[in-house]
Amino acid sequence: MDEDPEEGLLGWGETVFRDEHVFEIDYVPEVFRHRESQLQTLQYALRPAVRGSRPLNVVARGPPGTGKTTAVQKLFGELSGQPGVQTVRVNCQVDSTRYAVFSRVFEEIFDYEPPSSGISFKKLFGQVAERIADDDEVLVVALDDVNYLFYEDEAGDTLYSLLRAHETQPGAKVGVVVVSSDLELDVIEALDGRVQSVFRPEEAYFSAYDRAEITDILRDRVEVGFREGAVAEPVLDAVGGRTDEAGDLRVGIDVLRRAGLHAESRASKTVEMEDVDAVYEDAKHVHLSRTLAALSDNERALVRTVAEQEGDRAGDVYDVFNDRTDLGYTRYTEIVNKLDELGVIDAAYEQRSGRGRSRTLRLTHDSEAVLERL
């Protein structure tokens, strides 16, 4: 008997996925592996909130893609079911000023946005503090990617306002979870003395997953997100290896999603290595894509200029950048420093023949990959 040429092919209404949302960035897994000690630290710090007391503050730090945000989301999900506790997670990539942070907190507490203009920070802050005191609630705020507040020199004032809320409004109880992926940033040391004196956090370090842990976590996603048998163990193991090389779990999760879509484009019921190979180049830049997407127009303009003037002195890059944006040198330097801290560019001092030491700007990623994502 001849083999059926359509065997192993998807029908029009079929998919390799059981639940595609499993591979989205906001998905919180039911099973959260290899982070038991970090969760215990967070639970220890936040447990007083359930009893109506001010929780301990926490710094959660570690490389990108190591479960920090997921840990916070899981605990906040548990706390949200407790009476008298209000949790707010702020994405500091998006809300990178003190005013923006408190606007986000206001929106979560009141269920509507504050006026877009005409309301001072003092009034905004006062309304937030008064509301939680009047409702006798404990407010727990997570500043996710807090490094962005530091890049904008907004971290100290933001934390100070949150942690001193009880002085402005008696009865206001606020705890803060600070999440940072910048390993060169010492959050506590970077704060001035007035903030350090009231912050005094517990610390939870999220180390990079090893290859076995990565494969465990990806296997959980495959079992929940794909149809049975869609991803064979050798393919999963290969994705785990490439994820380990990339050093970011999110790369592996994105590879699985893209590979599944690629398999569907071939009408295949299974994800093969050819699908992984076809999508890996795009998926491995997932962190770069998100970083670039969060930049302002002027910051993106500077990235583009550095790509075009690769290896030029900072002064020469500024001349081109200034022609395009009209920004002054002080603001230019601030943007250079931010992009350097984000790991988008390398702004190093080098010895130049006959010119002494000067700052040279280079991209830290392949220029073609950067320009494609701007």
Curated annotation (Swiss-Prot):
Phenotype caused by lack of the gene: Not essential for normal growth.
Signal peptide: none
Molecular function terms, GO-annotated: ATP binding
GO biological process: DNA replication
Highest taxon, organism lineage: Archaea
Function: Involved in regulation of DNA replication.
Designated name of the protein: ORC1-type DNA replication protein 6
Organism: Halobacterium salinarum (strain ATCC 700922 / JCM 11081 / NRC-1)
Gene: orc6
